[in-house]
Design a protein with these regions (language model features):
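Amphipathic alpha-helical binding modules
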Residues: 91-134
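Residues within HEAT/ARM-like alpha-solenoid scaffolds
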Residues: 27-30, 34, 88-91, 113
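Alpha-helix capping and helix-coil boundary motifs
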Residues: 28, 55-56, 62-65, 73, ...
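Amphipathic alpha-helical interaction modules
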Residues: 38-95
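Short terminal alpha-helical segments
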Residues: 2-63, 119-126
């Protein structure tokens, strides 16, 4: 798959051939570690907390931010589908993140449980790489 992306306002276009795109194991592991951190951020976002762990958003604002963050995670994870399409942990992670969009504002315990589960799935993906499994 070839993607042409406009760069700036001058009409320049960057072309990337995704069929040739590959990360080495170290880069993939680092990317997955970042994903773990982004999954963990979901819970304080849902709770309306800032970086200092203080509640600064109303329940409604926090829920809106939670939905935006989930959209970001789903976009990021689904973008890696060519790399991970045969990995059971990846497939389950996508299902979980998409399913979390249906959670309501008052389902804190459910969000907390699934965030923990999602991070475990990503850790399992790292283990697959470290153990050279397919």
């Amino acid at each position: 798959m070839v993607l042409n992306t406009p760069i700036g306002r001058g009409g320049l276009v960057a072309t990337m051939n995704y069929s040739d795109f590959q990360l080495d194991d170290n880069a993939t592991i680092q990317s997955l570690k970042i994903l773990i951190n982004q999954c963990w951020k979901t819970l304080p976002i849902f709770e309306g907390k800032d970086k200092e762990n203080k509640i600064v958003y109303s329940r409604e604002e926090a829920y809106e931010n939670y939905q935006k963050h989930l959209c970001f995670l789903i976009t990021k994870v689904s973008g890696a589908s060519k790399i991970w399409q045969d990995n059971q942990y990846y497939v389950e992670l996508v299902y979980m993140l998409v399913g979390m969009q249906d959670f309501k504002e008052d389902e804190h315990d459910r969000v907390k449980y699934i965030v923990h589960h999602c991070t475990k799935l990503v850790i399992n993906m790292i283990d697959v790489i470290l153990n050279n499994e397919s």
